């Protein structure tokens, strides 16, 4: 086999294609979650806790340099000036994103499990109907009659 044929066989296998689709869907899902978090939930949480953008929340751990003329409330400006900062706001944003993603994935898993359970019940009912509806073959009926006759003679 040539390398091209081997590569074609490798790519055409279901696992590789499924993985590729999962990566693309994961990227799209990440964009949706980022939008839900950044555009919908974080403004509400920020309004409740007094700030719309958590990423700028920080605690100054050291002194501001003597010649500093920037804003004392700007995380980026203070960081560029070399002021030691404890920037917990971005961490809070990432934690909120994680909790939202975990909850949504949990709900998707619960829904998938419920749908699978219903599908299994439907399949079991179909199999029962098929088993009930299928006539017993004549040779089986004959063998049962012979068995019953032999039991009766004992």
From Swiss-Prot:
Keywords: Cell inner membrane, Cell membrane, Ion channel, Ion transport, Membrane, Transmembrane, Transmembrane helix, Transport
The UniProt record lists the keyword Transmembrane helix: yes
Localization annotation: Cell inner membrane
Keyword Membrane carried by entry: yes
Membrane-related topology note: Multi-pass membrane protein
Main subcellular location of this protein, as a coarse class: membrane
One annotated Gene Ontology cellular component of this protein: plasma membrane
Transmembrane domains' residue ranges: 16-36, 39-59, 89-109
GO molecular function (one): mechanosensitive monoatomic ion channel activity
Family from the record: Belongs to the MscL family.
HAMAP family noted in UniProt: MscL (MF_00115)
Function, in words: Channel that opens in response to stretch forces in the membrane lipid bilayer. May participate in the regulation of osmotic pressure changes within the cell.
Assembly and binders: Homopentamer.
Protein name: Large-conductance mechanosensitive channel
């Amino acid at each position: 086999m040539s390398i091209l044929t081997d590569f074609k066989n490798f790519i055409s296998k279901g696992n590789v294609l499924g993985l590729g689709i999962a990566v693309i869907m994961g990227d799209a899902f990440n964009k949706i979650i980022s939008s839900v978090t950044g555009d919908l939930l974080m403004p509400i949480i920020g309004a409740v806790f007094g700030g719309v953008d958590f990423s700028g929340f920080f605690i100054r751990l050291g002194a501001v340099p003597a010649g500093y003329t920037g804003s004392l409330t700007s995380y980026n400006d203070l960081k560029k000036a070399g002021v030691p900062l404890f920037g917990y706001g971005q961490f809070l944003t990432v934690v909120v994103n994680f909790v939202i993603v975990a909850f949504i994935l949990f709900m998707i898993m619960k829904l998938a499990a419920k749908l699978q359970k219903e599908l299994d019940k439907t399949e079991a009912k179909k199999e029962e109907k098929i088993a009930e509806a299928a006539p017993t073959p004549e040779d089986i009926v004959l063998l049962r009659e012979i068995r019953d006759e032999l039991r009766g003679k004992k």
